[in-house]
Amino acid sequence: GLGLLYTSGLLQEVLPELIALKGIEEVEGQTHKDNFYHTLEVVDNLAKASDNLWLRWAALLHDIAKPRTKKFIKPHGWTFRGHEFLGGKMVPKIFKRLQLPTDARMKFVVKMVQMSSRPAALVDQKVTDSAVRRLLFDAGDDVEALMLLCEADLTTKNEKKKRLWHSVAFCGI
């Protein structure tokens, strides 16, 4: 579906924000992944785990603001700080343009986009009970959907990273 839209040129007309994700830059020998292909992989991963249409929209749009937030900072490399929050702000404009519903379904997509990195961030730091409680409180009834999205977003080929994610993410959340 999405691949055909891309090769036909229609994706540029329908969702130019996705096309902006395409490409890899290199600065001082450091590159970042091609976020367009990463996004397609996330959508495919999620489709295997859920038939929730609105969660699939969240997967499609979860990195939509990365081109606007991309910076190279020495010595850390590429960062996309705040892409989740800016992406969440972009969702209503995209939904209105595509004449998608702007009701609770859109609000769910906004919430998932804005929270999409939160569970993974817990893996990168010492997990405290209060951090887990905040995540659960903020996610509310959507915690299972959020975890499915985060699992789908784990496209790394690094097996050590995958094991770390699973050991933290699924031990009681």
Regions found by a protein language model. Give the residues of each.
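Glycine-rich tight-turn/loop motif centered on a GG-T
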Residues: E28-K33
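Acidic catalytic cores of enzymes that act on phosphate-bearing nucleotides/polynucleotides
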Residues: Q12-I19, I24
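C-terminal subdomains that position terminal phosphate/3'-OH groups for nucleotidyl transfer/ligation
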Residues: A20-L21, N35-I173
